[in-house]
Amino acid sequence: MTLLSYLSSLCREATLSAFPQVENPSPDITQSTKEHFGHYQCNDAMKLDRTLKMAPRAIAEAIVNNLPKDNFSSVEVAGAGFINFTFSKEFLKQRLETFSADLSSGFCVKDPKKIVIDFSSPNIAKDMHVGHLRSTIIGDCLARVFSFVGNDVLRLNHIGDWGTAFGMLITYLQEEASEDVGNLEDLTALYKKAHARFAEDVEFKKRSQANVVALQSGDPSALNLWKHICEISERAFQKIYDILGVAIEKRGESFYNPFLPEIIQDLENKKLITVSDNAKCVFHEGFSIPLMVQKSDGGYNYATTDLAAMRYRVEKDHADKIIIVTDMGQSLHFQLLEATALAAGYLRDKETFSHVGFGLVLDSEGKKFKTRSGENIKLKELLNTAVDQAVATLKEHRPEMSEEEISQRAPILGINAIKYADLSSHRVSDYVFSFEKMLRFEGNTAMFLLYAYVRIQGIKRRLNIEKLNLEAVVNIQEPAEEALALALLRFPEAIDVTLKELCPHFLTDYLYMLTNKFNAFFRDCHIEGSPYQQERLYLCALVEKTLATGMHLLGLQTLDRL
């Protein structure tokens, strides 16, 4: 139970005791914005004044009179009727002992669920770009956090491995046998040539369309070329995932091909389809456009595939929750998809599906992040540049470091910096990409968190301690110790809100706050050689474990030295 839920339970019981006529009270508890207001604040009194026809302050006082006070050093009514709570140091000490055990085992939910997270999803024969970076690391972070609390998580890569483009590519490869395609760069160049010919040459277009039919019919020649194209792309994608430390299971669009005809038949049987301009569509009240599920030429589209995927994930994967991570530009599509899946009975309720949308990555001028020629920046090149920038940063700030040490640390620092900069931005917001900012040692950056972690490793080395004791006794005396203890105990709340809102920035905000509290503790409370060395090392141990856990959930790596 988090501190927030503990207080919520107390306030609910106190409200019912003071005012039995209030039905199902739902306490509004928040973390105090300023330390002199205490640790937490209850805002219920202002919401109950109309119901109870009483002054908010009188309501607050009645609630306080019915609260147990054992675990608090202070419970006060302030202002118009706010209730401010300050926990006792003894209570914080007891909670830290429980927190230490929970931190090692994970804050497991009572009722674990099957969560399917669809993220990354690049297209075959195309380079991954910065948009895929956002989907990949947001999806990976959410998967890690859902797993951490005990859920069964299936990470799916819904690769774009089917459609008209493949007929075009197969035709070009058949007719240009001299073209050597050994890697994704070759394939991307070939795609551009094939696309240009498809747009200009009517006969080539017809042959390409015929090859789509051949592919769908299982023609061996077309299938072999298709598999070759997919294998080249997937090898390149896997290199990116290895660099990012992302585990994901491939299940491309082609997987759902056998189910598409029955999806259309099922929608027709349920009388959900309307024919519009010879295309089969599903219309929904409140939407200006329908969801087209079959084109006028009889072909299927990605909406048909997405519906088949939705049904399969519920019926075969037994998903309790489906999360799809794509850019905000696809929001309308997923709203229509959800409405159709609900109407068809593929989703149990609106809680079963969430579209996790994200904003754009911008350059320093506030424009969409692209190359000078206007093309999407290749993700591979961006990651390589991040490592190069980390090398330059280390050479500037750590001139004594050897080339070998730099080569070992730079990849970790560069990739950490890119991930953290993205995850620390609210996912629905656009953010400005800046290597200079993300590699700073101060501010809300991966480097800032890592520096605190490394500082604790330095304490251990100086004291010749291999592993800090997570079972020692805590002794909270100084204000900085109290503030740090409270910050540690708020970690489960950060996990809860991250999962509730499906927004990783709540976790980065927490870790940044914790790091600041630790730095204040390190500044104000002498550790090495002090009479309270063991007790303060215990707090260091909890910070070390919490930072390491939090960074792992973000997909970041730790270092013992910077």
UniProtKB/Swiss-Prot annotation:
Superkingdom: Bacteria
Keyword Aminoacyl-tRNA synthetase listed: yes
The protein's enzyme class: ligase
InterPro entries: aa-tRNA-synth_I_CS, Arg-tRNA-ligase, Arg-tRNA-synth_N, Arg-tRNA-synth_N_sf, ArgRS_core, DALR_anticod-bd, Rossmann-like_a/b/a_fold, tRNAsynth_Ia_anticodon-bd
Biological process per Gene Ontology, one example term: arginyl-tRNA aminoacylation
A single GO molecular function term of this UniProt record: arginine-tRNA ligase activity
One Gene Ontology cellular component: cytoplasm
Motif ('HIGH' region): 122-132
Keywords of this entry: Aminoacyl-tRNA synthetase, ATP-binding, Cytoplasm, Ligase, Nucleotide-binding, Protein biosynthesis
CDD domains in alphabetical order: ArgRS_core
Catalytic activity, as annotated: tRNA(Arg) + L-arginine + ATP = L-arginyl-tRNA(Arg) + AMP + diphosphate
Places the protein is found: Cytoplasm
Keyword field contains Nucleotide-binding: yes
Its EC number(s): 6.1.1.19
Pfam families recorded: Arg_tRNA_synt_N, DALR_1, tRNA-synt_1d
UniProt-listed HAMAP family: Arg_tRNA_synth
Subunit structure comment from the entry: Monomer.
Family classification: Belongs to the class-I aminoacyl-tRNA synthetase family.
Protein name, per record: Arginine--tRNA ligase
Organism this protein belongs to: Chlamydia felis (strain Fe/C-56) (Chlamydophila felis)
